[in-house]
């Protein structure tokens, strides 16, 4: 929920076209309850963790904050923020996700999903705007499909059913600039509806297989062509 705001932090991360169309057609949109199963599980997990956090005197749970950006009111609700020894705060966000969201690459390196890094750094900006000093950001990932067998077989697969991952903390300037740009894009979409870009559509470059003349099969492998639909070989 965005509360009394024009957009929430998670709303700003949505494609501007999607958000604008949702605003226009909000009264007629429907959703199959069966598609909300994982969301329900996630809410239950959040509820249990929040109740546990309420027992920690140095933690604040479900804090909703507001700030003004470009004439809009922006809100964000953190799962948990924890006070550090030097009077700073660490933001922790719970994610109930598939294990492959945090599977390491072939080099054994964990690549943090961009949308999570963006989300938490916008939370950090909100906290700073409300007088908090932010010292760190963390994702608490709870894997809904974790497999002990897969963890033994693949060292790049998450080795535990739940893990905590540090998130890169941006500078105050970078976090502010990012939020301002997202607000601008969403405001522009209200008067001139943009198309979603490739990243927002999860699109990948087209690939075309090379096929020898008089052959009904493609050669092993493929190649990317930009601006050309066919490749002829002689």
Feature map (PLM): residue ranges:
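Generic solvent-exposed, charged/amphipathic alpha-helical segments
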Residues: 46-50, 120-124, 180, 184
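Hydrophobic side chains in beta-strands
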Residues: 82, 94, 139-141
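Metal-dependent nuclease catalytic cores that hydrolyze phosphodiester bonds in DNA/RNA
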Residues: 1-91, 98-117, 128, 149-156
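Metal-dependent nuclease catalytic regions and adjoining charged, substrate-binding loops involved
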Residues: 70, 125-234
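A general alpha-helical scaffold signature found inside nucleotide-binding enzyme cores
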Residues: 114, 118-121, 174
């Amino acid at each position: 929920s965005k509360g009394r705001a024009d957009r929430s932090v998670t709303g700003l991360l949505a494609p501007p076209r999607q958000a604008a169309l949702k605003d226009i057609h909000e009264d007629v949109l429907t959703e199959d309850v069966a598609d909300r199963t994982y969301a329900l599980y996630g809410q239950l997990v959040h509820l249990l963790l929040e109740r546990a956090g309420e027992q920690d005197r140095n933690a604040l749970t479900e804090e909703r904050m507001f700030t003004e950006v470009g004439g809009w009111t922006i809100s964000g609700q953190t799962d948990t923020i924890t006070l550090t020894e030097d009077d700073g705060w660490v933001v922790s966000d719970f994610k109930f996700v598939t294990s492959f969201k945090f599977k390491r690459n072939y080099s054994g390196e964990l690549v943090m999903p961009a949308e999570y890094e963006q989300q938490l750094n916008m939370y950090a900006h909100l906290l700073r705007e409300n007088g908090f000093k932010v010292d760190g950001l963390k994702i608490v990932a709870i894997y809904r499909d974790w497999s002990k067998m897969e963890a033994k077989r693949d060292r790049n697969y998450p080795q535990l059913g739940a893990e905590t991952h540090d998130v890169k903390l941006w500078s105050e300037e970078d976090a502010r600039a990012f939020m301002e740009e997202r607000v601008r894009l969403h405001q522009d979409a209200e008067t001139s509806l943009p198309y979603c870009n490739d990243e927002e559509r999860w699109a990948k470059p087209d690939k075309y297989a090379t096929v020898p003349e008089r052959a009904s099969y493609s050669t092993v492998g493929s190649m990317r062509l930009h601006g050309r639909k066919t490749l002829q070989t002689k």
